[in-house]
Curated annotation (Swiss-Prot):
The keyword RNA-binding applies. Transmembrane segments: none annotated. Residues 143-166 are annotated as: Disordered. Belongs to the SmpB family. It holds the Pfam family SmpB. It is found in: Cytoplasm. HAMAP family: SmpB. NCBIfam families: PRK05422.1, smpB. It comes from Prochlorococcus marinus (strain MIT 9211). Its main location: cytoplasm. The gene is smpB. This is SsrA-binding protein. The lineage of its organism: Bacteria, Bacillati, Cyanobacteriota, Cyanophyceae, Synechococcales.
Length: 166
């Protein structure tokens, strides 16, 4: 009998298996994110190839809960150029998100009671699976955004002043 050799996974392979594919940076500016949830996403083959190539836009995306299912709307996944028109997918189709029933019920209660919204924050690989992180967010008003910008600017000024006097 021959023994099987244990194959060691290198750091570069591990990093490739857990890389971020798309991010919605604008969401963190427009919404105050209260809670996040990692879910799976139901995709077709050409969508998987396109997401892995980085051809995804999360900026206008949002999530809804309809008939007990979590759905992703308005996320643009570009069609593949070399797949032809017959096998390609609709770029803006509604996609089902995969989460446990308890998690969906918890999100549904939060969205209905507090007037919060569900926003896609990022898409990443977890092993060979494509996962999406959605956030429960409360919309920011203009004055909240200005306060945040002032606070960030003050921190930058303080760091630059400390760097000058070192």
């Amino acid at each position: 009998m021959t023994k099987k050799k244990n194959k060691k996974v290198t750091k570069s392979e591990r990093g490739e298996a857990n890389r971020r594919l798309a991010e919605n940076r604008l969401a963190r500016h427009q919404y105050e994110i209260l809670e996040t949830l990692e879910t799976g996403i139901e995709l077709v083959g050409t969508e998987v190839k396109s997401i892995r190539a980085g051809n995804t836009n999360l900026r206008d995306g949002f999530c809804l809960i309809r008939e007990g299912e979590l759905q992703l709307h308005n996320v643009h996944i570009s069609p593949l150029n070399n797949a032809g028109n017959f096998f390609n997918h609709d770029p803006l189709r509604t996609r089902k998100l995969l989460a446990h029933r308890k998690e969906i019920n918890k999100l549904e209660i939060q969205v209905a009671r507090k007037g919060l919204t569900l926003i896609p924050l990022s898409i990443h690989l977890k092993g060979s699976w494509i996962k999406i992180i959605i956030g429960v967010g409360k919309g920011r008003k203009l004055h909240d955004k200005r306060e945040d910008d002032k606070r960030k600017q003050a921190n930058r000024d303080m760091k630059s002043a400390l760097a000058r006097y070192r």
